[in-house]
Structure formats: C-alpha cells, structure tokens
Regions:
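Acidic, polar-rich N-terminal leader regions of halophilic archaeal proteins
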Residues: 1-88
Length: 88
C-alpha cells in the first residue's frame, strides 16, 4: 500500500492522484490539509467562509490540536510524522 492509500484508509482522508486531502472544521476556522507523496510534505490551506476559496497558511498559524492530529494520522499511515513540520 502506498502512502496516499494508507492515509485514505483513515477517517476523512480522500485521494486525489498523488495527494491525499482531509478537511477540518474548528469552531471558527476551516482548513484543508494536503499530503503530497512525491515531495513527502504537508500543506495547510485555510478555507474561506464560502468554502470555495482557500489560501496556503504557515503551519505556525494552525492550531496545535490540528497539527497533532495530522501527525497522528501520518504515524498511523506509516509515514514519518516529521514531514508535518518540514519547511516547503
């Protein structure tokens, strides 16, 4: 099983070619998190209220509980959780 398939076996993750994506909705903020297999990295996107527009955001602006969840998902999928903090 490749890394994208491994992530999509977890709750909320969906495959899109060589990437896997999950959406997170907090009390006030909405995020789309993407794992890219070729570059072995995570990108965070903040989704605007319309649900159609997203802008990339630095991980330091992402709530710690969400970052922790993403690292846990990576671990469960057999991916080194340190890729979550890799600078892109």
């Amino acid at each position: 099983m490749d890394t994208v398939d491994a992530l999509t076996s977890l709750e909320g993750w969906h495959a899109e070619g060589f990437a896997a994506r999950v959406h997170y909705r907090g009390a006030d903020d909405h995020y789309s998190i993407e794992y890219y297999e070729p570059s072995d990295c995570i990108l965070y996107w903040k989704v605007k209220g319309d649900g159609e527009t997203a802008v990339p955001v630095g991980r330091e602006t992402v709530p710690d509980p969400l970052r922790k969840r993403i690292r846990q998902d990576l671990t469960e999928a057999g991916i080194d959780p340190d890729v979550e903090s890799r600078v892109v």
